[in-house]
Amino acid sequence: MAMIEVEHLQKNFVKTVKEPGLKGALRSFIHPEKQTFEAVKDLTFEVPKGQILGFIGANGAGKSTTIKMLTGILKPTSGFCRINGKIPQDNRQDYVKDIGVVFGQRTQLWWDLALQETYTVLKEIYDVPDSLFHKRMDFLNEVLDLKDFIKDPVRTLSLGQRMRADIAASLLHNPKVLFLDEPTIGLDVSVKDNIRRAITQINQEEETTILLTTHDLSDIEQLCDRIFMIDKGQEIFDGTVSQLKETFGKMKTLSFELLPGQNHLVSHYEGFSDMSIDRQGNSLNIEFDSSRYQSADIIKQTLSDFEIRDLKMVDTDIEDIIRRFYRKEL
């Protein structure tokens, strides 16, 4: 059985359309015009136990609404979601013991309490037995390296320390599923790497199923087994990072370093179209569709125009592919 099951999930919001001016405001008050907005449209997917799923999309795509339904905050208009065999909205008090949630821009920690005291409070909230609590704290201390600041008040923690502390708080009760919303937002490179290593270790050692939403595509490449991308509430891609690159990463770039003193313009490339050619000084970059053109033909044409010192092939990275998705270029 899948750890996360989503079938024909739909969420509609009804909003009132307000007309401008005093008359419009009065008319809207007496006879309000209602419009239905479909935030999530017929989503269906499954996440097996132990998988890290990158759940991505542009702002307004429906990610947050979907997460709120999966965590039991919102009730679906139709369809259903089931986490570890439980429907989130049916018995939230029991259900939340199966999940952990981390929001990068919000904290679940108590600002004025020392971090250790916060975990003690959470132990009581989640009804964690003493023996399990000490075992979990030993594990989380080791993985997330909390020992240097665990006695400090939460308000004194740096952003990176607070994020590690939040992840530990969400894992204290040993949840089956972890929802991570922008876990590395605002962090520097080294701290991001530490957070990613910790998430990977937790996933591998405990088989925790993780649903990750992020705009940092390095998180996706380094952490996720699979990508589920939505736009306007609908699925537009479901597959691995390599499948995404294979399907949509057909654009490649040949980057040439020219010998100095060649100031003439690039000649017309006979038989080629839809290529982007960028010449700056001794650098020449040619972007082309590898499903239509052979790189050898482009290199041959370029060698007939210029003397080349060096060249390299650059594949389209995941960030560029998803950027094109957002711009509706794919």
Named regions from a protein language model:
Residues 112, 153-157:
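Conserved ABC ATPase signature
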Residues 174:
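Conserved catalytic motifs of ABC-family nucleotide-binding domains
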Residues 196-289:
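ABC transporter nucleotide-binding domain
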Residues 178-182:
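Catalytic Walker B motif of ABC-type/P-loop ATPase nucleotide-binding domains
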Residues 21-29, 120, 124, 131-149:
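Conserved ABC ATPase "signature" region
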Residues 79-90, 95-96:
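Conserved ABC transporter NBD signature motif
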